[in-house]
Structures are given as structure tokens and as C-alpha cells.
Curated annotation (Swiss-Prot):
Taxonomy of the source species: Bacteria, Bacillati, Bacillota, Clostridia, Eubacteriales
Source species of the chain: Clostridium botulinum (strain Langeland / NCTC 10281 / Type F)
Cofactor: (R)-lipoate
Protein name as annotated: Glycine cleavage system H protein
Pfam families (alphabetical): GCV_H
Domain Lipoyl-binding: start-end pairs: 22-103
Record key words, sorted: Lipoyl
Length: 130
């Protein structure tokens, strides 16, 4: 299982990559492993204002449907339209296949996210339970 050191994570297995005031959001390798084969992604709309903790996307796999929760508040400025035609990209490259980019309204919310070394331990524990 892969955890990248240049990202921040949530307990719900989303990752955040920050570029200035923009944050790219996706699902972690741990999440895509739990979901198994992803068959559909319901993307948010550009210009949607989403608060931290709100659902911003729904991911359907052969196992289940799972909501993805926004790790930081702000306005959606970009969506990864490739996922409409190729949702399996989240399985193939979970860290290269972001779901949405958000213009953050409060960068201080980043401080509440999980550091890579801590997230890696969380995933290792989940692997042991599986």
C-alpha cells in the first residue's frame, strides 16, 4: 500500500495536494483497495461552494457506493472529467487521478488533516484487520 509524503489525508481516506490556495482532492490507495473495482464517479460541479465535511463526490464500485467528503472548505474550480469515461483510473493511479480541485476559503483547515506518517499507520492497521 502506497502513502505519499507530499500529501495530507483524512480519516475517510481522501488525500489533499496543496498548490498555493488551490487543493486537489482524491482518494487514497487504501480507499481504492477497500472499494475494489470502481465503476462510476459522480463528480461535483465547477463553482459549487462546499464546506469541509460535506459530500462532494460519490464513488461506486462493484462492492459498494461510497461518499467522498470535502477535507477543506471552498469553491470547486476544476473537476477531473477523465473520470466520467474512465472511473477505473482511481484504481490504476489513485494519487495521479484527482477528483476535484478547490479554491480554499480557509487554509487553516489544512492543520486538521492527517500527516502521511500517521495515515500510513492507520492503513497498516486496516490491512491487518482485513
Amino acid at each position: 500500500m502506497k502513502v505519499l509524503n507530499n500529501l495530507l489525508y483524512t480519516g475517510d481516506h481522501e488525500w489533499v495536494r496543496v498548490e498555493d490556495n488551490k487543493a486537489y482532492i482524491g482518494i487514497s490507495d487504501c480507499a481504492q483497495r477497500m472499494l475494489s473495482d470502481i465503476v462510476f464517479v459522480e463528480l461535483p460541479e465547477v463553482d459549487d461552494e462546499i464546506a469541509k465535511g460535506e459530500t462532494f463526490a460519490t464513488i461506486e464500485s462493484v462492492k459498494a457506493a461510497s461518499d467522498s467528503y470535502m477535507p477543506v472548505s471552498g469553491t470547486i474550480v476544476e473537476i477531473n472529467e477523465e473520470l466520467e469515461d474512465n472511473p477505473a483510473a482511481l484504481n490504476e493511479d489513485p494519487y495521479g487521478s484527482w477528483i476535484a480541485a478547490i479554491e480554499m476559503s480557509d487554509k487553516n483547515e489544512l492543520e486538521e488533516l492527517i500527516k502521511p506518517e500517521v495515515y500510513e499507520k492507520i492503513c497498516e492497521e486496516l490491512d491487518k484487520e482485513a
